[in-house]
């Protein structure tokens, strides 16, 4: 792909969420979402492989459906209330439709089935963009909404945490595991959205840091399956020692960074007399923790076969880990002691 085209597409990726996040009008916000979608589709299809083309087609159809639902809901709201403002979503019907449309856009359960399949068909770099940057614009809208249907958000959140944990248990492909991990984390964010939007924002920020560090390490090691992780210690030994901690942090294990949002969310849920919901969410975190432990075990406690097939990947030259990957990995592990400062920063 021409560097000029790539630069234009990356500019579109930056422009779309910026328009959506700064807009207060539904039509402008919808345009920002569509710019974002149209910018990533050529990046997804740049490798002319049947799986990539299939993934791009699935992604386009899903996003087009969600965009049509969103436009229909905002038009219905304007018809019923005479308002196009984001904060004036007062009627329950368009409000529910918009939440479902945004849930389909980001891949919340039970509207999640496209996400693992699409992510599996992409290369790791585009998968990183899809799992992190593409979540920002829909979340910018969700954070501005005043939800009229809190029960729907709780149902979507609990289903996502359970299905995200359950779905990743029998996977061997890293991209599918990270897709189910994404679904589970999005469930935690939606669960707490109506009670503490700033806590949702904090959870989203930490999710972006931890997921980016995992993806960047897999990109450096060129690994896409659990079996290939066994050879990664010979390629980048320092990162291989850090990545299991990053994965356990994604699972929410103390004393790592990922424990912070889960701990704060469970505390907030119990404050609002939702102890059964908090219990279900905590149990679903154990499901997710199991497949993160599988990955950590494959990286640290297994030895690759000592034959020609197993030895060849060790001898490939890899690029040296860059500063961004190292910084993100460190942030994914070491931020828990800074919880009081972070809470003050976010006014939680």
From Swiss-Prot:
Its main location: mitochondrion. It is found in: Mitochondrion inner membrane. The keyword Transport applies. It is a multi-pass membrane protein. GO terms for cellular component: mitochondrial inner membrane. The chain crosses the membrane at residues 1-21, 60-80, 96-116, 149-169, 177-194, 198-220, 238-258, 273-293, 328-348. Its EC number is 7.1.1.2. InterPro entries: Complex_I_Subunit_2, NADH_DH_su2_C, NADH_UbQ_OxRdtase_chain2, ND/Mrp_TM. Core subunit of the mitochondrial membrane respiratory chain NADH dehydrogenase (Complex I) that is believed to belong to the minimal assembly required for catalysis. Complex I functions in the transfer of electrons from NADH to the respiratory chain. The immediate electron acceptor for the enzyme is believed to be ubiquinone. This is NADH-ubiquinone oxidoreductase chain 2.
């Amino acid at each position: 792909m021409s560097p000029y085209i790539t630069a234009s597409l990356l500019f579109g990726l930056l422009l779309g969420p910026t328009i959506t996040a700064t807009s207060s009008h539904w039509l402008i916000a919808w345009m920002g979402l569509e710019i974002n979608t149209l910018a990533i589709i050529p990046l997804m299809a740049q490798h002319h492989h049947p799986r990539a083309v299939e993934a791009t087609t699935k992604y386009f159809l899903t996003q087009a459906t969600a965009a049509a639902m969103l436009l229909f809901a905002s038009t219905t709201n304007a018809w019923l209330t005479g308002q196009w403002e984001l904060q004036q979503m007062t009627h329950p019907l368009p409000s529910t439709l918009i939440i479902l449309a945004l849930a389909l856009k980001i891949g919340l359960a039970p509207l999640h089935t496209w996400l693992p399949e699409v992510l599996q068909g992409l290369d790791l770099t585009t998968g990183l963009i899809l799992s992190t940057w593409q979540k920002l614009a829909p979340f910018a809208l969700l954070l501005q909404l005043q939800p009229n249907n809190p029960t729907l958000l709780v149902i979507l959140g609990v289903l996502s945490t359970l299905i995200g944990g359950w779905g990743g248990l029998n996977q061997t492909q890293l991209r599918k595991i990270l897709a189910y991990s994404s679904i589970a984390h999005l469930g935690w964010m939606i669960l707490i959205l109506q009670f503490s939007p700033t806590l949702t924002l904090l959870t989203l920020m930490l999710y972006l840091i931890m997921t980016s560090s995992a993806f960047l390490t897999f990109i450096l090691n060129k690994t896409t399956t659990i079996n290939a992780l066994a050879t990664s210690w010979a390629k980048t030994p320092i990162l291989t020692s850090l990545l299991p901690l990053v994965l356990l942090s994604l699972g929410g294990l103390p004393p790592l960074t990922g424990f912070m949002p889960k701990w704060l969310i469970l505390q907030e849920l119990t404050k609002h007399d939702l102890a059964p919901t908090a219990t279900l969410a905590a149990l679903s975190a154990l499901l997710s923790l199991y497949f993160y432990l599988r990955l950590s075990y494959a990286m640290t406690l297994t030895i690759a076969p000592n034959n020609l097939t197993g030895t060849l990947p060790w001898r490939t030259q890899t690029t040296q880990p860059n500063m961004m990957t190292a910084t993100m990995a460190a942030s994914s592990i070491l931020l828990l002691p800074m919880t009081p400062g972070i809470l003050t920063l976010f006014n939680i």
